[in-house]
């Protein structure tokens, strides 16, 4: 049990972090959206960033509402928000993975025929890849939608079933949903991890070839991408730690430690959002007043 004053302090920190992330996401969407309206085209990385900005904007608002409903025991509202949070959470994971794969293909110095083939075609495929992320997300949240519907029906029953067999089946079904949601996040994480390793290998190869004294555009591109990927790796790891804490949540009061953990996790998300903004040449040019 932590003091109420400390909980309030971390709650305020979490709200400030969330509002900052919302402003950052809004800025990404507004700036890149204006650029698209003016010139009727966007750089490929900006297409991913504007999709990620929209997803993260919706995710952050849903996350705030979800956390406060959990903390204050608004169970019925929580059930309705959970499916929305799950959708934008999975979509954000897939968009982040797509961004890392794009960086890996376009920035790496590998000359393997498969890499060259992908590098030539990924620009044409990008709109379809974004649509694919959306479709995969819709499919993967179907079990969660079914589970939330059952839970809402259970909460609204005037006389809930007391049969232990029914309750056990519901508990097993929720365990299955938890595992399905974890798998839906593990797959994009593996894609992200593979892309990161390949980029690191490419950077090492470049350093060995050119020496540490040279700083060509390719090296700068590597460092920019790896800066974003390093922070994103911390975010992914932090999120999996939250899943682990949820699984062993009987050891402590999750509601008591909610704001401490959320403030910790969203500090990394804030850093990643900032890094993403700096990784876009269009955003850097406009924000620096060089448009």
From Swiss-Prot:
Major localization listed first in the record, in broad terms: membrane
Species of the source: Papio hamadryas (Hamadryas baboon)
Protein's recorded name: Taste receptor type 2 member 16
Gene from which the chain derives: TAS2R16
Entry keyword annotation includes tRNA-binding: no
Subcellular location: Cell membrane
Segments on the Cytoplasmic side according to the record's topology features: 23-41, 106-125, 204-228, 279-291
Biological function: Receptor that may play a role in the perception of bitterness and is gustducin-linked. May play a role in sensing the chemical composition of the gastrointestinal content. The activity of this receptor may stimulate alpha gustducin, mediate PLC-beta-2 activation and lead to the gating of TRPM5.
Listed transmembrane segments: 2-22, 42-62, 85-105, 126-146, 183-203, 229-249, 258-278
Lineage of producing organism: Eukaryota, Metazoa, Chordata, Craniata, Vertebrata
Highest taxon of source: Eukaryota
Glycan-linked positions: 80, 163
Further remark: Most taste cells may be activated by a limited number of bitter compounds; individual taste cells can discriminate among bitter stimuli.
